[in-house]
Amino acid sequence: MTGRSRVLAMRHVGGVSPVLVRRDLFLTRTLCSHGPSQPREKRPEEVALGLYHRLTALGAALGHSIRQRASSTAKTWWDRYEEFVGLNEVREAQGNVTEAEKVFMVARGLVREAREDLESQQTKLKEVRDRLDRISRDDNQYLELATLEHRMLQEEKRLRMTYLRAEDSEREKFSLFSAAVRESHEKERTRAERTKNWSLIGSVLGALIGVAGSTYVNRVRLQELKALLLEAQKGPVSLQEAIREQASSYSLQQRDLRDLVADLKGLVQAGTGQGSLSQAGSSPTQDRDTDVLSAALREQLSHSRQVRSRLEGLREQLDGLEKTVSQVAGVVQLAKAAAHPGLESADGALPGSLLEQGSMIMALSDTEQRLEAQVNRNTVYGTLVTCATFVAVLPVLYMLFRAS
């Protein structure tokens, strides 16, 4: 870069002191730029560390914003609750009472100061009057003391007026303080009445919700009991039909097996009666018939084993179902005993006898009807009690709201 600057140079003139002259000098400045530097590649540790720091900062900022939002939301809802209950009005009234008390105490202090000043002035005036009484009227100090007494009387009058104004201000501030206290007490009483009324309303609503919930729970239990009874009614019938079908098929297979064995015996006896001449020519046919019969016999035996295993499984299921039905019958018996405590103890053997006589379905149906009637009766009683409670509480609520 080339630039031009004006400098001062020394020039020696022959026999003359050196003088400063201005010369124009050209300065040349060369700027060397470095070659393009290649960016340094970051190591994976540095990249991971930077990412960790960024994520930490982001998490901290996010947590701070979430805390601020949660605190603002909680404060908003708390302010709404205080406004709804009336705590804001009570707090404002208490603040007014505090301010009125401070003003009253200031006025009281002013009254005290004015009274002290007035008493001090009266004391001084008394001293001056005593001196006037002791000095003769022809004395030179008498005029000075009379003038001082006059000034002190004027000052006493001013202090007395100040004291009276301070007392009036004190009475006014005391009346304002009393009004603020009464207002605070009224606001507190109103808040207490409102809280009591809302508590009563909440109790009534809670009772109604409890009755509705108990009714719903009883209905759901009744439906579950109905489903259980229906399953208990359908289970033995379907299982007996399946056992009957399997038994019939087993008997048919046994009869077919006996017929097959008889045919096989007849064929064996017929084969032994033939001569040795026809034995060589008919041996392939006889072997083939024997193989067919053996295969049929093996198939029949395997089918019989399968049928027997199925029958055993059905018998186990029947035993389990009988246990379940006996348990259900015991539960029904307990419910019946709870509904009718005057029944005899001999009815404890009712489920077993009903199961043996095949009349359990009728007993279950009867028990279902009784339980349904009892649940309906309890629901009706609960509804009547709720209605009566609401009718009894409604005039009380009306009187409370009217009074408040």
From Swiss-Prot:
Principal location listed in the UniProt entry: mitochondrion
Membrane topology label: Multi-pass membrane protein
Residue ranges annotated as Mitochondrial matrix topological domain: 31-196, 402-404
GO terms assigned for molecular function: mitochondrial ATP-gated potassium channel activity
Name recorded for this polypeptide: Mitochondrial potassium channel
PANTHER family noted in UniProt: COILED-COIL DOMAIN-CONTAINING PROTEIN 51 (PTHR28624), MITOCHONDRIAL POTASSIUM CHANNEL (PTHR28624:SF1)
Location in or out of the cell: Mitochondrion inner membrane
Extent of the transit peptide: 1-30
Its job: Pore-forming subunit of the mitochondrial ATP-gated potassium channel (mitoK(ATP)). Together with ATP-binding subunit ABCB8/MITOSUR of the mitoK(ATP) channel, mediates ATP-dependent K(+) currents across the mitochondrial inner membrane. An increase in ATP intracellular levels closes the channel, inhibiting K(+) transport, whereas a decrease in ATP levels enhances K(+) uptake in the mitochondrial matrix. May contribute to the homeostatic control of cellular metabolism under stress conditions by regulating the mitochondrial matrix volume.
Membrane topology (Mitochondrial intermembrane): 218-380
Transmembrane segments: 197-217, 381-401
Reaction catalysed by this enzyme: K(+)(in) = K(+)(out)
GO biological process, one term: potassium ion transmembrane transport
Keywords associated with the record: Coiled coil, Ion channel, Ion transport, Membrane, Mitochondrion, Mitochondrion inner membrane, Phosphoprotein, Potassium, Potassium channel, Potassium transport, Transit peptide, Transmembrane, Transmembrane helix, Transport
Activity regulation (UniProt): Channel activity inhibited by ATP via ABCB8/MITOSUR subunit.
InterPro entries for the chain: CCDC51
Subunit structure comment from the entry: The mitochondrial potassium channel (mitoK(ATP)) forms a heteromultimer.
GO cellular component terms given for this protein: mitochondrial ATP-gated potassium channel complex; mitochondrial inner membrane
Domain of life the protein comes from: Eukaryota
Positions in coiled-coil regions: 111-138
Residues annotated with Phosphoserine modification: 65
